[in-house]
Amino acid sequence: VPDYQNPIISPKPLEQPGVLTATLDSSQLERILKEISEVVAVADATLDRESLEVRVTGPALEIRRAAYALAAKSTDSLFAPTKILASPVQLFLPGATDTWPRNTIVVTGENSLQVLVLRQDGPRDDYKLYQYSDLLPNISFPEVPAEVVGANALKEDNKFLSMDPASLVEGLGNLLNRGFESPWALLIDPDNQYVADV
């Protein structure tokens, strides 16, 4: 009779409940970023909206397709799609989870920086670019867990959040429309130069 409590004799290793590890390491990330940036660069060269789907999804796919539509109607380089920066990696925050979808946040670039959100929908799916944005100059990053540890995603009902994420979208819209007359203005630092610029 097998001894299922002994990992040496047991036919499969014992599970360690509650221990979550990072879903990606830096060598995997480097390969994924290289593959994504190559697919996007080829699609950018021909404004091929369909080939993007291989490694781009969600809001990033919508943004890229809209950029291609603008670029197709203009010869001005101002409307050229933003290049996806695969390196150097400035910040790498993989998820720590055993479920899907899995998300990883990466900040890349040198003189100009981008934040990229990568998502894997299932265990047999490739990571795809889910969201991206250029960052403002002189931005500083908060301290994050080490890449070997990863980070857990917060649930919407987390008690440590000052508001639920669903309300945040409504509040941001109200704030943009009404400015400092919005009841949401109390949550904004009035001395923040970025807020004044927007």
Feature-to-residue mapping (PLM):
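Short, low-complexity N-terminal intrinsically disordered segments enriched in polar/charged residues
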Residues: 2-42, 54, 94, 98, ...
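Short solvent-exposed beta->alpha transition segments
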Residues: 49-89, 188-198
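Surface-exposed, charged secondary-structure patches
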Residues: 71-115
